[in-house]
Each structure stands twice: as structure tokens, then as C-alpha cells.
Regions:
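Conserved small/polar residues in nucleotide/adenosyl-binding loops
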Residues: 1-5, 274-281
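Zn2+-dependent cytidine deaminase-like catalytic core
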Residues: 7-104, 192, 218, 223-225
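Proteins enriched for Cys/Gly/acidic motifs involved in redox and nucleic-acid/cofactor modification
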Residues: 22, 86, 100-128
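Gly/Thr-rich phosphate-binding loop signature of adenosyl cofactor/nucleotide-binding cores
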Residues: 268
């Protein structure tokens, strides 16, 4: 979500909500204002929140800052807000103009709207293939079938999403870090790493497990091997156990669990099987 503050036809502050749990866009914009905000207008893509969650209510911050007018792009579908933010502002003497560019804001904040309405992450599938439709060389190598620009785009995408998901086969074959090393964005954000590993085969000496203390890492499994589970947890990984679906992790249940954890978006980077499983349940994702 994005916010801009204007006073005397000048922009005096801009802000945005970077990720779940951090400053909301209104408070981010206010924190960047180096002059008096009394009497200013704030333009917001989403109705300001009015409840206590990971962050305090933005409506209170706007009142305290002396904002006189709020222009809202779209209403918040969250039942905790949904019109209550507008009501609070109006009750405190702030002029409100609502839904001035609703469709554009829906497109801009598609991840948020999907998450709020479905209580599950928005999932994007990423794949790479050769001109003749292959996802790897005839020897099974898939790491370098794309060019430098495509790999940079992948890292930029990782910055945009809350989590990245792969199958255990990718970890065994490529031993990836699954971090964000984008040079196109400042302060790149490492997504939560999720490995779908039905039988807990992820190598304990893999780069992902060894760096679990630095980057949040989740292993999703349907295995009940408590000893093996403890080894991953001792290494810093979180282990999620789902019911079994055709001898594999139940993706529907996993999406529900991840949604409850506040993970609103996932980029799925995986070889054919995990893509197939995700595609089969896509209507529910």
C-alpha cells in the first residue's frame, strides 16, 4: 500500500507498507515528513486501518498529525476495518473522499485483497524453459538454462513476495540458497523459504538448512519421524506437518496454515512435479 501527503500543492511525505508487521504506509509517510503536517491532505491507496494489530491504528496517527483531508483509492475489505476507518476519521472532523480510483488500486494491491478475502497466500508460479519446451538439459541440469537478465528478474521477484517455495528435489539437485540478491532494489528482502519435503529428505548440510538461523526456513512434510523432525528444528528450521495427499504434502492444508502465519504471498520456484501438484489445487490456492 502506498501513501502520499500534500500541503500547499507540495508533496511533503511519501510512504508505503513494506511487509506484514512493519509500519503501515500512513505512519511511514508521516515519519518522513520534515515539516508541519497540520492541515495537509493525504492520498492513500487503501482505507486507513482503525484497529490494533501488529501496528497501532493509522486513523489515530492521522488525527494526531492534524491531517484535514483524506483521499482514499479503495475501501479495505478486512472486516476489522471495512468502513470503520472512514467513520472514525469523519467523527474526528477529517474530510474523506472515497474510492476515487478503485479498480486501479485493486490491481495495485492484488496480493493484499486476495489474502484478506481468502485467508491464504497469493501464489505465483515461476518456471524457466528452453525454446523447445524443456525445463532442463538432457543430463538433468536446470540451473543455468536462463540468461543473466532472467536471473536478475527472479531475484527482484523474490524481493516482492513474502515467501519462496520449492520441492525437496530442487534442494537435493541444486543446493540453492533461495535468498534475494537483486541489484535492482535497495535493501533487498529475503523471503521465508518453504521446502515441500514429504519424507524429510532435505540434506542437513544443505545451504538452506545451514543458513536457517539467518533466513526463516519452513520444511513442510507429512512425515511423522519425530527424530528427523528434531534435527531440522535444532538447525533453526520450522517443521509443518500436514496430512498426506497421494503420498505428498497436502498443499491445500499447507496454504491454510501459511495464511494463518501471516504469509500473504508465495513465489513457487520448482521443477515439474511441485508445479503439477500446485496446478491441480490452483482453484483452492
Amino acid at each position: 500500500m502506498y501513501k502520499r501527503q500534500v500541503k500547499d500543492d507540495r508533496i511533503i511525505g511519501e510512504g508505503w507498507h513494506r511487509k506484514y508487521g512493519e509500519l503501515h504506509a500512513e505512519r511511514d509517510a508521516l515519519s518522513k515528513c520534515k515539516e508541519d503536517t497540520n492541515g495537509a491532505t493525504i492520498y492513500v491507496t487503501l482505507e486507513p486501518c482503525c484497529h490494533h494489530g501488529k501496528q497501532p491504528p493509522c486513523t489515530e496517527a492521522l488525527v494526531q498529525a492534524g491531517i484535514s483531508r483524506v483521499v482514499i483509492g479503495s475501501m479495505d475489505p478486512n472486516p476489522l476495518v471495512s468502513g470503520k476507518g472512514v467513520k472514525y476519521l469523519e467523527e474526528h472532523g477529517i474530510k474523506v473522499e472515497g474510492c476515487v480510483c478503485n479498480e486501479e488500486c485493486l490491481d495495485m494491491n492484488y496480493v493484499f485483497f486476495h489474502y484478506i478475502r481468502n485467508k491464504e497466500p497469493y501464489v505465483v508460479m515461476k518456471t524457466a524453459q528452453t525454446l523447445d519446451g524443456k525445463i532442463a538439459t538432457y543430463k538433468g541440469f536446470s540451473k543455468w538454462i536462463t540468461g543473466e537478465q532472467a536471473r536478475e528478474n527472479v531475484h527482484a521477484d523474490r524481493h516482492r513476495y513474502a515467501a519462496i517455495m520449492v520441492g525437496v528435489g530442487t534442494v537435493i539437485a541444486d543446493n540453492p540458497m533461495l535468498d534475494c540478491r537483486s541489484t535492482a532494489v535497495s535493501n533487498p528482502h529475503n523471503p521465508v523459504r518453504i521446502i515441500c519435503d514429504s519424507r524429510l529428505r532435505t540434506p542437513l548440510d544443505s545451504r538452506i538448512v545451514k543458513s536457517a538461523g539467518q533466513i526463516p526456513t519452513i520444511i513442510a512434510t507429512c512425515s511423522t519421524d519425530s527424530d528427523r523432525k528434531s534435527l531440522y528444528e535444532n538447525a533453526g528450521c520450522e517443521v509443518i506437518i500436514t496430512k498426506e495427499s497421494e503420498q505428498h504434502v497436502d498443499l491445500k492444508e499447507l496454504m491454510h496454515i501459511l495464511g494463518e502465519k501471516g504469509i500473504d504471498s508465495i513465489i513457487l520456484e520448482a521443477v515439474s512435479y511441485t508445479h503439477l501438484r500446485a496446478h491441480e489445487t490452483s482453484q483452492d490456492l
